[in-house]
From Swiss-Prot:
Domain of life: Bacteria
SMART domains from the UniProt entry: Ala_racemase_C (SM01005)
Gene: alr3
Protein name per the record: Alanine racemase 3
Modified residues (N6-(pyridoxal phosphate)lysine): 42
Gene Ontology MF term list: alanine racemase activity; pyridoxal phosphate binding
Organism the protein comes from: Salmonella typhi
Reaction catalysis annotation: L-alanine = D-alanine
């Protein structure tokens, strides 16, 4: 009888090195000190498995965790100690705020109405929850405007509140160090300090942590950097923290003129050896995956042929002699996450966030 792990591995194996995640966190925390270093684990920890990653980071003294949705917050709250703050970046609707209080989950307040509702709710409680407000300094996504934040200062004074615990904003171009908007957004955050001089402030995401030290403020929020995703200009090396391997389902030699895949977008112009691989776009393999990306067999690159299917895709294995059941690397040493993303005209974030539930996930312990 097959074990569940063997059944799941039939699609592919996603191996997460928790020791590397922890090492990256500690490296980043040292880099931004004395600022506090949190951890962004939205989208199931960027597709890798937040419920295993969060406790490992907590053991490494991370005490503030960011997710996007309420369901993600509940999942983390259930496994983290009470002294860990769980913050919802998307905030919540007013009707969900009492539930957040009961669950010790902190929504990031993204409008004046949300701030007013949250303050009123806390004033009726014996134990007040933290107040975190998002400032829209240049994303035009979520948060109060600078003008609204200035008006909120008067409201706080009228209601007897000193200040929000945190005012948080988000850089729109942190991956472009010389972009003028970075300076503009930082300037708006400095102006916010006139209204709330005693609040703590947060601006830097993964890339923002490697801009000028002033951008680090009181709290930094690394996300993909925890998993080794870095820009070439980062001053501190990070460790890749996961690999994804797939399985060859079939190997077939085909003659000239053989159509391959949906839409027959590729027709062979020479005899080829085609290998069919065990995952597809239902598992997060981008449908628009293009050569030179594909898979790697013992370090040899096998480029994709034709369109990725829902549950499989084909590669050119003419240079080797693989067999059905062989394990091939999709993300790892021989084909990096960044190379896969570039071949799909996207970013590493998207590739990670789309990693599917059908993969077997192996968590290598941080103690190893």
């Amino acid at each position: 009888m097959m074990k569940l792990a063997e059944i799941q591995a039939a699609c592919g194996v996603l191996c997460v090195d928790l020791a590397a995640v922890v090492d990256n966190y500690q490296t980043l925390a040292r880099h931004v000190a004395p600022a506090q270093c949190g951890a962004v684990l939205k989208a199931n920890g960027y597709g890798l498995g937040a419920e295993a990653i969060a406790p490992a980071l907590y053991a490494a003294n991370c005490r503030i965790f960011f997710v996007a949705q309420l369901s993600e917050g509940v999942a983390l709250r259930n496994i983290l100690s009470a002294d860990a703050m769980v913050v919802l970046l998307n905030g919540v609707m007013p009707q969900a705020m009492p539930f957040c209080c009961a669950q010790q989950i902190t929504p990031l307040l993204n409008s004046v109405d949300q701030v007013m509702t949250w303050l009123a709710l806390q004033e009726a409680r014996s134990q007040r929850r933290p107040v975190l407000i998002q400032l829209d300094s240049g994303m035009s996504r979520l948060g109060v405007t600078p003008e609204q934040l200035a008006r909120l200062a008067a409201i706080f004074r009228q209601r007897g509140w000193a200040a929000p615990d945190y005012i948080i904003s988000h850089l729109a171009n942190a991956d472009r160090p010389d972009h003028a908007l970075n300076v503009y957004q930082h300037t708006l955050l400095q102006q916010a300090k006139k209204a709330f001089p005693t609040s703590r402030y947060s601006l830097a995401n993964s890339c923002g942590m490697f801009l000028h030290p002033a951008w680090r403020e009181d709290l930094c929020r690394p996300g993909v950097a925890l998993f080794g995703v870095a820009q070439p200009w980062f001053s501190t090396p990070l460790k890749p923290a996961f690999t994804l391997t797939l399985t060859i389902l079939r190997v077939q030699d085909v003659p000239v003129g053989t159509p391959i895949g949906y839409g027959s977008t590729v027709t062979t112009t020479r005899p080829l050896r085609i290998a069919t691989v065990s995952a597809g776009y239902a598992d997060g393999i981008p449908r628009n995956l293009r050569p030179p990306a594909g898979v790697c067999w013992r370090g040899v690159r096998l480029p994709v042929l034709g369109r990725v299917c829902m549950d499989s895709f084909m590669v050119d294995a003419s240079a080797i002699m693989p067999t059905s059941g062989d394990v091939v690397e999709f993300i790892g040493v021989s084909q990096t996450l960044e190379e896969v993303a570039a071949a799909c005209d996207t970013i590493p974030y998207e590739i990670m966030a789309r990693l599917g539930a059908r993969f077997r996930r192996i968590m290598q312990p941080a103690e190893a």
